[in-house]
Structures are given as structure tokens and as C-alpha cells.
Curated annotation (Swiss-Prot):
Cofactors, names only: Mg(2+); Mn(2+)
Pfam families (UniProt xref): CDP-OH_P_transf (PF01066)
UniProt organism field: Xenopus laevis (African clawed frog)
GO BP terms in the entry: phosphatidylethanolamine biosynthetic process
Annotated region described as Disordered, given as residue ranges: 1-22
Topology term for the membrane: Multi-pass membrane protein
Protein's cellular compartments: Endoplasmic reticulum membrane; Nucleus membrane
Protein name: Choline/ethanolaminephosphotransferase 1
């Protein structure tokens, strides 16, 4: 995520052919990857060319990052040099996803109490993700394997992790009993992550605030630990002075964080454009990215409020995951647009799932909304996976590298 991104400095380019590394023992995996890929390469030659010119730029440090750097420096030394940076990233993401999915299994409506070990596993899983996410860039520099694929892969994993992290937090505090607050917290988290890359698309520089992702992750880890120790009674207790349930404390923090972060983001978006006449890095309108995340949030809100069967209230986790996958997809496309200095197009297959839900409601839900939600979830997940795999393979092939292995001889592309 963002504070850790300061520790990641990786860049590169791409090709449109399939990677040349499909020999034994990777043939099966490569064939499967080829099957998943989109029929047409997602990136044009012009985008690939501009990607080669991309240079990573960042500024600012969060409050706790300097304190964590010593641990991260020690940790990366423990990692064998043959392990690829992207492999470190994906392992951390999978740990984060698995621990959250277990929590979802026990708390599908975010109102149930899960076994103590599930909250502990989420806390440990998030800490492991944070740590691995922080050292993958260090491993890239250490192994002389920095490429543009690394930066894109890192941000892509972060976009998906954000969905599971915010959902896991809502489950931990049983926020499903307050569906409006749960809806706000989840989509506020996705929106803020999108805005972080939106302002980067405008200014060309990724900015870190004094309170950034490292601090938020540690706060969420504490929430999981409190859930394990205190159980449901903790969240039902009232906060002195404020006189609101303890479970709303993370929600109130989300409100404050959203106002603070968005104020800074939009200040950059409206005044920090580096393109012609204050436009984005691609020369497009600074407001154009709003159409994508705005469409996600508007559709999610309309479907939530118009459902005749209380679809979100009864199945909040499935609902958040469905729209979370769509949000992750459009965020990834925004990152690609920034790195390739290209325009974002509104038409996107990611919206097929939400469109099905919307149309089904428009025609008086002639198909069970719960069934359509599952269909939308599967379609959104498949669309995200196909796009991500296609982009990664196209870049890897163009660079003559492998996504999850370090070649003995490879060029290093410094972008910082």
C-alpha cells in the first residue's frame, strides 16, 4: 500500500507476445495463463513505448514509516535472493485474502461473532501483508530486478487488498448491524485508494501523508486484536462523551480520515496538473477519472437503496466483494493510464456485473436478486483476473522477464 510504496522502486516495458518461459516445469501454469488472457492485448504499442519512459516519483513520509524501516531492512535480508519481488507481493496478498475469507465464512452478514482465532489470523495476516508489501521493492533493488511491472503489480495487489482489509474491519466490529455505516466505510476506503492514484495521474507524483496506509493498517490490526480479546460485548459498550456504540468508532475515524485525505487529494487534483493547461500527465481533463469511480459508487448506492429484498443488508460481504472487484479493476486501469500517459476510457467490461443487478431491479427483479448478485460477483472477479493476467503477461513478454521468477541476466530499469 501507499507508505510501503516508498520502499518500492521498480520499472520496465512490455511485448505483445506470450512469455518465453513456458518450458518445464512452468508449461502447465503458462498454458493456463494463456487461456485466461484476453483475446486482444490490453496495451497498445504506444502505451508500451511510453511505459518505458515512466519514472517513479514520490514525496513525503508517514509518521510510522521511519520507525518500521529498521524492521523491514532486517526482514528483507532474511529472504533468499532467488525469490522474485512479485512473488513476495502475491504471497502477502494471498495471506491477506485467505484470512479475510475465513472471517467472511463465519460472519457472512457482518453481524455474527467469529471464533477468536479468526480475528487473530486476520491481524497476523494483515501484518504479514504489510511487511511483505514493504520489502518487495527492497528485494527488487537487492536482486537488481527492478522493472515497471513491479510498480504496477504492487499497486494492483494493493487495490485488491484494500477491498478485503476494509471488509474484514467491518466484520471485526460487527458493523453489519448498521448497514449504512458499513456501506460508507467500505466504499470510502476504496474511494480514498482510488483518489491516491487519481492525484498521481494528475501530478505525476505519489504523495504520502503524515497519516497514511501504514498507520491505518496498524489501527486495523489493533481492531482485530480487540475483537479477539473483547468479543461482541466490547463493540456494544458506549464511548464516553460521544455516547455512541464502540463499533462506530472505526466508522467515525473513517469519516475524519476521508475528509482529511480527500481535502489533500483534491487540492492536488485541482491545482497540481502537470499536463498542458493544468491537465493530467496524459493531457486529459483532471476530472475525467471521476466518471469511473463515480459510476461504481452510484451504481452500488442505487442498487443498495432500490433492492426490494434488502440485498445489501442480508448479503453485505458478497455485495462489497462484487463492487470491490469492479473498483479494483478501474483502479488498476488508472494506474496503467498514469504509467503509460494514456487516457482512461469509460466503457469497461467490469461494469457488466453491476449492470445486470441494475437491469434486474429495473425489470422488477424477475430473477432472484441473490442469484444475480452471485453472477455479478463471479463475472467481476473473472474480469479482474483476466485483465490483470493479460497486462502482466504482456509487460513481462515485452521486457523478456518472468512475473514470478528472476532471470539470471536482466536489465535494470531505475525509475526513481
Amino acid at each position: 500500500m501507499s507508505a510501503q510504496r516508498a520502499a518500492k522502486r521498480r520499472t520496465g516495458d512490455f511485448h505483445s507476445e506470450f512469455p518465453s518461459s513456458c518450458g518445464n516445469p512452468y508449461q502447465t501454469a503458462c498454458l493456463l495463463s494463456k487461456f485466461i488472457e484476453l483475446p486482444n492485448p490490453p496495451l497498445s504499442r504506444h502505451q508500451l513505448k511510453r511505459l518505458e519512459e515512466h519514472r517513479y516519483q514520490s514525496c513525503g513520509k508517514s509518521l510510522l514509516e521511519p520507525l518500521m524501516q529498521g524492521f523491514w531492512e532486517w526482514l528483507v535480508i532474511q529472504v533468499p535472493q532467488w525469490i522474485a519481488p512479485n512473488l513476495i507481493t502475491i504471497i502477502g496478498l494471498l495471506i491477506n485474502i485467505v484470512t479475510t475469507v475465513v472471517l467472511i465464512y463465519y460472519c457472512p452478514t457482518a453481524t455474527e461473532k467469529a471464533p477468536t482465532w479468526t480475528y487473530l489470523s486476520c491481524a497476523i495476516g494483515l501484518f504479514m501483508y504489510q511487511s511483505l508489501d514493504a520489502i518487495d521493492g527492497k528485494q527488487a533493488r537487492r536482486t537488481n530486478s527492478s522493472t515497471p511491472l513491479g510498480e504496477l503489480f504492487d499497486h494492483g495487489c494493493d487495490s485488491l487488498s484494500t477491498v478485503f482489509v476494509v471488509l474484514g474491519t467491518c466484520i471485526a466490529v460487527q458493523l453489519g448491524t448498521n448497514p449504512d455505516w458499513m456501506f460508507f466505510c467500505c466504499f470510502a476506503g476504496m474511494f480514498m485508494f482510488y483518489c491516491a492514484h487519481w492525484q498521481t495521474y494528475v501530478s505525476g507524483t505519489l504523495r504520502f501523508g503524515i497519516i497514511d496506509v501504514t498507520e491505518v493498517q496498524i489501527f486495523i490490526i489493533i481492531m482485530h486484536l480487540l475483537a479477539a480479546i473483547g468479543g461482541p460485548t466490547l463493540w456494544l459498550s458506549m464511548i464516553p462523551v460521544l455516547n455512541v456504540p464502540m463499533k462506530l468508532f472505526p466508522a467515525l475515524c473513517t469519516v475524519a480520515g476521508t475528509v482529511f485525505s480527500c481535502t489533500n487529494y483534491f487540492r492536488v487534483i485541482f491545482t497540481g496538473g502537470v499536463g498542458k493547461n493544468g491537465s493530467t500527465i496524459a493531457g486529459t481533463s483532471v476530472l475525467s477519472p471521476m466518471l469511473h469511480i463515480g459510476s461504481v459508487i452510484v451504481l452500488a448506492t442505487m442498487i443498495y437503496k432500490k433492492s426490494s429484498v434488502q440485498l445489501f443488508e442480508k448479503h453485505p460481504c458478497l455485495y462489497i466483494l462484487t463492487f470491490g472487484f469492479v473498483s479494483a479493476k478501474v483502479t488498476n486501469k488508472l494506474v496503467v493510464a498514469h504509467m503509460t500517459k494514456s487516457e482512461m476510457h469509460l466503457h469497461d467490461s467490469a461494469f457488466i456485473g453491476p449492470a445486470l443487478l441494475f437491469l434486474n431491479q429495473y425489470f422488477n427483479s424477475f430473477i432472484d436478486e441473490y442469484l444475480v448478485l452471485w453472477i455479478a460477483l463471479v463475472l467481476s472477479l473473472i474480469d479482474l483476473i483476466r485483465y490483470s493476467v493479460s497486462v502482466c503477461n504482456q509487460i513481462a513478454s515485452h521486457l523478456h522477464i518472468e512475473v514470478f521468477r528472476i532471470k539470471t541476466k536482466m536489465a535494470r530499469f531505475n525509475h526513481h
